[in-house]
């Protein structure tokens, strides 16, 4: 990712060009994991309606948390950086259906029964951990009313500006 950004900045002749990373569903899942492990200069990372989340805990195995990872990928410093990342969980309040492609493994169901529940639970868990440890918390949670698992509707909703820019 950093080389791609460098290339675009070089091609545009704008070495300080700001950028934002936005993904829906599996794209959101990818960006949550990117926020956890890859330092970025992104102004904001927006994960819209991911099917599962990466809870900032070693009590849940990787894929759903940081458990069973080597210490260099799961230390308190890694968790602290993850919680400080400019991550927005952008959730449609209508994304409550349990579809065949939604991860229904026991580890996923521990996060919540659907995408909305999982996003809310992960945000609350992360916010409480940051508060308890006195760590910077760079995450935001933005909900858009009534929208289900639909990228076009999510990104056309007025709340998308708040998800990306905080407005």
Positions of PLM-derived features:
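Alpha/beta-hydrolase active-site loop
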Residues: 1-12, 19
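Catalytic metal-binding/acid-base residues of hydrolase active sites
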Residues: 27-29, 51, 94-95, 148
């Amino acid at each position: 990712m950093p080389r791609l950004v460098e290339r675009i900045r070089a091609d545009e002749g704008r070495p300080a060009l700001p950028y934002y990373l936005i993904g829906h569903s599996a794209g959101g899942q990818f960006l949550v994991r990117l926020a956890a492990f890859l330092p970025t200069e992104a102004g904001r990372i927006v994960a819209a309606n991911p099917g599962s989340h990466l809870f900032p805990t070693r009590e849940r195995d990787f894929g759903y948390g940081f458990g069973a990872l080597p210490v260099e990928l799961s230390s308190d410093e890694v968790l602290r950086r993850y919680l400080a990342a400019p991550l927005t969980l952008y959730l449609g309040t209508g994304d409550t259906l349990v579809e065949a492609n939604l991860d229904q493994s026991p580890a996923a169901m521990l996060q919540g029964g659907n995408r909305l529940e999982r996003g809310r639970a992960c945000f609350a868990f992360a916010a409480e951990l940051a508060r308890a440890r006195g760590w910077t918390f760079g995450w935001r949670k933005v909900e858009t009313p009534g929208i289900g698992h639909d990228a076009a509707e999510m990104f056309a909703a007025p709340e998308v500006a708040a998800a990306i820019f905080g407005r």
